[in-house]
Amino acid sequence: MRVCIRKNYKVALFSAIALSSSLFSVNSFAEDSSNPFSIIQSEPKSQLWINPGMASYHFQQDKNFNNGNWGAGLEYRFNTVASVTAGRFYNSDRAYSNYAGVYYQPIAIGPIKIGAVIGGFNGYPTTNNGGWFAAALPALTWEGDWVGANVFVIPTIGDRVHGAISLQLKLKVFEPKSE
């Protein structure tokens, strides 16, 4: 178990360093057209998205975790770089979880927004006895005219958090017509 935590700590540290480096390169070379990164201009928006939960691929395949994390959720995009989200899903431990959070994604590579979702979750029996806990997860988002997708990377933390890559498809159900 300690090896798993150390390994994930190293991956998280490397990811943080790489992200920091890319942020500096985005600012340094914003005018360079060969740089694939761009800073998203913060502008007001009003979009409501619904989702059916997530499909996950767990890193520990031998543990028989639930990969079909289906449920229902809402995401309200109030800005080009930020949105709020809340919902409920059947989690990896085969129990129900609730969540609420905020996405902040100020960077893009082409149509993909890059950032994090920060919020709270509950319903995991081995984490805080099923109570609420805070989490910050790297998140990628693609949004088309009516459909979109969020991808999350969840680190393994001992027996409390089950590492996975999760895909959440979403459907836009409301956006006022622009004048």
Residue positions per predicted region:
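Short glycine/proline- and aromatic-enriched beta-strand/turn motifs that initiate or cap beta-hairpins
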Residues: 30-78, 87-88
